[in-house]
Each structure stands twice: as structure tokens, then as C-alpha cells.
Amino acid sequence: MLRARPSHRLASAAAVVAATGAALLAGSSPAAAATCSDVDVVFARGTGETPGLGVVGGPFVRSLTGELSDRTVTSHAVDYAASSSQASAGPGATAMSAHVREVAAACPSTRFVLGGYSQGATVTDIALGIRTGTTTGTPVPAELAGRVAAVVVFGNPLGLSGRTIATASSTYGPKSKDYCNSSDSVCGSAPKTGTGGHLSYASNGSTTDGARFAAGLVRAAGTPTTPTPTPTPTPVPTTCVRDSTRDHVAADRAVSLYGRAYARGSRDSLGATSSYNVVSLQQVEGGWRLVTAC
């Protein structure tokens, strides 16, 4: 759970983001097109930012699109309030996971890159099933975890508790990267990855580096495979013949061995080869078997 002091830091950082957002806000990429893309980037903006990808998400998506120039890349800005109270992170996580579920169902070959900045990183944490102690939301279903190729977050408040996604999630940790600048108090004691403060991720190379990281994992993941339906076996025509033992032998439905007849394949005993007793044989895969009647 976030302590009172870190919450003040978050509020202060949020005010700075809101005040400078108009100057720094990058244009959001278009939402996912009607046709399915190879990669869909789902990004949550920071506290107080204008709806869209935000000051960090925009540059990150542009860099990732450039890194994956041989693939189709779409982006989706998570629709949530990004309020200063941080309580909107839970509903934001629910919105993020809902988008992943919707696209995954419609586009079985699409891979996802999830990410967020500041409170948007908390949105991402919760969507990955990480308990943050601030609010709750609906995570991405476990069965879709394999469709998420990479997770990249910037200025993640999870660092205030000394954690990163890599240490908090065994499922998503190996394919995640947390960026926390040396002077960024919002991400607390998380390992430092670059210079500057909470507003420097788009200008200090973090978004470019994060895009390279995500692109590498997207390429390594390949294309999701759609399970091949199990073919319905072709029914074997059922034939049943009622005849004398000797006639079954004559028709090769039975074999004779030392004066006794046996159904071909199953070796069911039919009695003496020369017998005129009438018995029923049913055709099965690989031969015939003795049945009570046809």
C-alpha cells in the first residue's frame, strides 16, 4: 500500500505533468483498425494527462512502430480517468484487460505490448494481476498471458514498495522492463535506468530503448498458433454377415487352423471348420468379430 508521503510525491508529479502536458503531449496513434494487426500496443497515460497515449506513450509507440517496420502495428490508449487520487487505476486496469480480451477474440494472430506511464504504470501492474494496495481491477485472463509479448512501463509507483514487474510477477516478469529515472521519486527505490526526473522518459532515450526491448520480444514470440481442430474420424461401414462356419471360412471372413475356425482379425473361435452351425460375424477395423446376432 502506498504511504502518505509517496502519495504527496505522486500528486506533485501529477500536477507537473498536467501543467506541462499541452507542450509535451505527443499525437496518439489511431486506434486499432477494423482489420487485425500483427501487434497491438495498449498504453495507459499518466495522471492528469489529456486522453490519448500521453507524453510518454506517443513517442514509445512511434519508436516501436519504426522498430517493427515489417509488421503492422496499431495502438490503443486506455480509456480511464487518470485522476489525481490514483483510484482510477483499478478501472483503468479493467479497461485495459477488456480491450485485450476483445481484440484477442477477434484477432487470433495479434500479439500485444502493454505499457503505461506514472499512474498508467499502476494500471498496467493491476492488469497483470499485481496487487498494488491502492485499488483493484480485472486482470488479463491467464489464458491470454501468452499473447502478451512484452510489457514496458515508465515511472512505475510500484517502485515505492521496492518492487518492479520483474520481481512481482512470475508470469510477466521475464518479458517486462521498468524504467525509473535517477531523480524520479515516483518510482521510489526501483533500480535506476536513466538520468532526469519524472518528465524525462521521452527525452532521455528511455522510450526508444523500451521500444527496442519490446520489438525484440515480439520477434522472438513469433505468430500465435491456432490449435488445429481434431479431424472427425470417418465412420467405418458396419457389415454383419450371418452364415455357416464353413461358409465364413470359404468367404475369407474366418481362417481355419487345425480343423477349427477363427474370425479373421479378432481370432474369435467359431467352432469346427466343417460345421454347418450358423454364426454372425460383424466387420470391424482390421477384420471380423463374433457377435450374438446381426
From Swiss-Prot:
The record marks 119 as: Transition state stabilizer. Disulfide bonds join 36-107, 180-187. It catalyses: cutin + H2O = cutin monomers; a tetradecanoate ester + H2O = an aliphatic alcohol + tetradecanoate + H(+); hexadecanoate ester + H2O = an aliphatic alcohol + hexadecanoate + H(+); a butanoate ester + H2O = an aliphatic alcohol + butanoate + H(+). Its EC number is 3.1.1.74. It comes from the Bacteria. Residues 1-33 form the signal peptide. The active site is at residues 118, 184, 198. This is Cutinase.
